[in-house]
Amino acid sequence: MSLERVLKTLEGFGLSRIDAEVYVYLAKKGPKKGRELANALQVTKQQLYPSLKNLKNKGIVTANLERPALFSAVDFEKVLELLIEIKVEQAKVIKETKKELLGSWQSIS
């Protein structure tokens, strides 16, 4: 699988392009500090840190408690499972919304 295909797949699961690039870089290169990541990915720290926060909130990236923090990627297979689980939950919500909308539709005179 090519890098571009991996990035596009992660985007399809709801990650932004920068989130996908940050995750893949950490997964392939190992734990890095924010400054190292920003330099390697040629992004500003102002672009990087919201992405890292988003990835941490999704359970895709972890950070230690040191200063400066060292960021690590969660195993790719586990990330795929997490992202698939999110999509399955979203599909359930959509199905429930469909039922509610159909009920509302039928009650409209």
Segments from the language model and where they lie:
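Short, cationic-aromatic polyanion-contact patches
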Residues: R5-D19, K33, T62-I86
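Amphipathic alpha-helical dimerization/coiled-coil segments
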Residues: E81-S109
